[in-house]
Amino acid sequence: MKRLVIYFHYDPAGCIDTACRIAVQAVQKYGRVVFVTNGTLAPADRVWVRQSGAGRIERENVGFDVGAYREALLTLGREKLAEYEEIVLMNYTLAGPVCSLAAMFTAMDARPELDFWGLTRHYAMQSRRFGGAVPEHLQSHFIAVRPRLFNSDDFWNYWKEIALPASYEQSIIRHETRFTPYFAARGYAWDTYVQTDDLKPVFVNPIMACPRELLANRGCPFFKRRSLFTPYADELRRTDGLAARELCDYVTAYTDFPLELLLVSLLKTQPLSALAQNLHWCYPVGAPTGETPDLNELGLRLLHYEQPAADPVTDWYNRQAAANADTLLAEAAALFEKNPMLGVLSPSLPLWQGCTAARRAAWMREKDALAQEVSVPVGSDPPPAPNCGWVLVRESAFPDGIPACTSQRDAWKLALTAQKNGAYAAAFEPLTGSAARADILNEYETAAAQPAAVAKQLGRLVKHRLQK
């Protein structure tokens, strides 16, 4: 089949990371690729596109994927596109493939009754964020269209008349959730390669909610980058919160996809806290063995810094955590061998709620200045480490030398510097801490479900606001 793939890309620095290159090279086996980027490519990356044999369009960063697809289609033109048997609109938000694409294209080539098809679908739902009633639709990260559709006036009118989005939400409303029902209503037949109708009562967005299931059992060759950094509170409203960790464990164990290289790329563009929450960078360790590791031989260095002033209870728990960490030094050091990208490690924050409140308040005071100093993205949540005045670092994560670390601010800068260098920060805790964390969560969930607790919390919030 003569196929054209229009591949949309965006990177604020104009770089094409390994995951994008793998995807482009994979689809090139099945068609000609036109690489469309919203921005200006770095010189070396522009050379890579040329050497790959792909076409290239560099454009102003307007209109998100919608603008990129529209410009590519209108630039190539109706007459040129009529030479193809299938046109694929694909974007960089997919990572992979984790397996050969032959099965997917062979299966869909055997379905000539379809006028357009996609990799996955999103089921109908209600969403204020996305304009109310969201219909069932193909997800725009991969949509293939065939001649009866792309040679029609319907197709070209759609793209000529579409209003370019100015936000992610507008992109979903104006294109992703509209494309499928728009053409289905005009008599064009569609379906997905990955079949998930049995999951419809469970998840509206299976590729995000259960990516491991789709890869392991349903032949899906791609997963979403966003799985690794999506807002974790949103995930907990839809799932058990384990999707990203299970996905990464599967990809690492059962595929050849270089997940570590994707993580290096994401560390440059996503807050460390978002990645840490989704990937659960808090490691349980067993009882201390009493061994004393040779940190110099392991390329590690133990640093201590002064904790911010706090109330007596918070201060006591922080000091206890640091003292306990000293007894677990061998177990902590072993985590670096197991996790090659680990650069900064500390004990997890004590479960005492005052510790959490104090750390968050300090982070909110420092985060914007730290982001500017280190030039990495930060979120409203602090990194998972360092905590409690105790931090173990991998020397190779700091090729320019380990910065001085005498305060909590310095410690956060240490974690962000490691992030900039392609390493992550994590926490560790004894098994008793992990068990207690589960019990505390259960207690909070039970209490939060009580109407009296909700009313009491609202009263506290109102009182707090009035006192300000």
Stretches found by the model and what they are:
Residues 1-468:
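ER/Golgi luminal nucleotide-sugar-dependent glycosyltransferases, focusing on the catalytic module
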